[in-house]
Amino acid sequence: FLPSREYHSAEDVQAAVDEMREFFQTGATMPLHYRRGILVKLRSYLKKHEKEALQALTDDLGKSSFEGYATELGIVYDEIRFCLSKMYGWAKPKRVPTPLAHFPSSSKIYASPYGVAAVLSPWNYPLQLALVPMIDALTAGNCVVLKPSRTSQSTSAFLQKLCEEVFDERLVRCLPGSSEMNDWILSIHFDKIFFTGSPTIGRQIMHAAAENLTDVTLELGGKSPCIIASDANIKRAAQRVAWGKCINSGQTCVAPDY
């Protein structure tokens, strides 16, 4: 697979983001039937290329097809199904109380998308943690720049192919590459940044986002104690602790630490 477009500088990335922002400002992503169509098309593509996706996970991480489906692809399908079932309700205006000083007016909250969002995903769940936040952003009506991890090269190549074959490039772009690509992305003003990874990189992203007061969601892992009550079934508890620690070779943010 050869990408249709290459990015050699921050200026190239900026030009791409500018095109996406112009597309967003046309209002093309606002109709719910448009968003629904995107999710249905993505699901159909994944179903058709399921073996390819699972093989990429095997190539990168040694995951069996069962584990790849259970911990990644199946979760992506669940997210698509959930968003399809809830998106119309989420989009409805929500009536809220109005202060007496504003009588006789009424108040509502209208949900609106941010604009162009950046999703920076990690290598340990390279499919799930790239597609799930992207699906959520698209459901809300955003455009998305996806930056997958350079460590999971096979999955990143699959994601780039998926993005080019499923989406209008003004809606979604996949920008794989080195840490230099991360620097280029962080030098640009996005309307939302979603990052999963280490606290060290998370601090850099928060610092860069502060320059533009960009809204940020950081999932940085942490410590995960496992508490076993005195009246627990010890055998069953031990099995579950071992499963939680060993699944994905222990590379899970909530794997039991102690």
Describe the residue ranges of each PLM region.
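N-terminal Rossmann-like NAD(P)+-binding subdomain of aldehyde/semialdehyde dehydrogenases
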Residues: F1-K108
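Active-site phosphate-binding strand-loop segment of PLP-dependent enzymes
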Residues: D168-M206
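ALDH superfamily catalytic-core signature
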Residues: Y7-S9, T200-Y258
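Residue-level signal for inorganic ion chemistry
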Residues: R35, I80, G141, V172, ...
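Short gly/ser/thr-rich secondary-structure transition/capping motifs
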Residues: V96-F103, C174-G177, R240-V241
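Short beta->alpha connector loops at strand-helix junctions that form conserved
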Residues: N142, K147-S149, P176, T196-G197, ...
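Conserved small-residue-rich beta-alpha loop and adjacent elements
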Residues: T98-R170, L213
